[in-house]
Amino acid sequence: MHSDCDSDGDGDRVASTAPAALLESAELAGRVDAMWDDAARALESARALSEQVAAAAQAMARALDGGGKILVCGNGGSAADGLHFSGELLNKFRRVRRPLAAVCLAADVSTITSIANDESYDMVFAKQVEALGRRGDVLVVITTSGNSPNIMRAAAAARTAGLTCIALNGKDGGALSNMLRDGGDGDGDDGDRGDGNGGRDIDIIAPGDSTARIQEIHAIIIHAFCELIDLQLFGES
């Protein structure tokens, strides 16, 4: 999905809509080659995340094996990534196996707009975490910047309820990284530490500043999660 669709607030700026001369196909192909090269460099840098990705998959497999569930949320393109992930868990990834409990909190437009209208868009995920999350569950938050207020609120609600929070993050990690590292609660009041999960959170920050490359890395990490969760719960295929 186009990076502008991710409403983290710091995505690529909208370009001018003034008419432009169409480029020759050879020049367009060269642009595509440059994108492949850029994506390859980003993916190579992401190898440094392997241990964190493995630890996150282990935490999710442990939760599922113990009767827990995976909650997922994100905005825009990251919401689509969340739907992708929950769908792979509920149905299957590469093998036929029993369905796994996963809920994407960005899927129910009636609930989201109700909360946004009656209270605040900042609370659209947090209230669902409060209602659905139980100690031992895992919340996966997906953001390209770490600065979306509703993601911060969701992570804070998860910590308070005793859920493990796994962040697929980007850029410098933003305020979310600070909260997960320092144990804050996302509302600026350090008096309520919101540390009910015992410090089990995992913050996976995709390298680079390009929103598009960050989203591509997130998609591959999601596939790695699916592969590793299936491996732990069901063995080699």
Spans of features found by a protein language model:
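Glycine-rich phosphate-binding loops that contact phosphosugars or nucleotide phosphates
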Residues: S78-G235
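Generic N-terminal amphipathic, Lys/Arg-enriched alpha-helix
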Residues: M1-D6, D12-A48
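Hydrophobic beta-strand scaffold residues
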Residues: I70-L71, C165
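A short, well-structured juxtamembrane/interface segment
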Residues: S45-G66
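Structured helix-beta-strand junction loops
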Residues: G66-G67, R135
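Flexible, glycine/charged-enriched surface loops at secondary-structure junctions
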Residues: L49-A55, P99, G235-S237
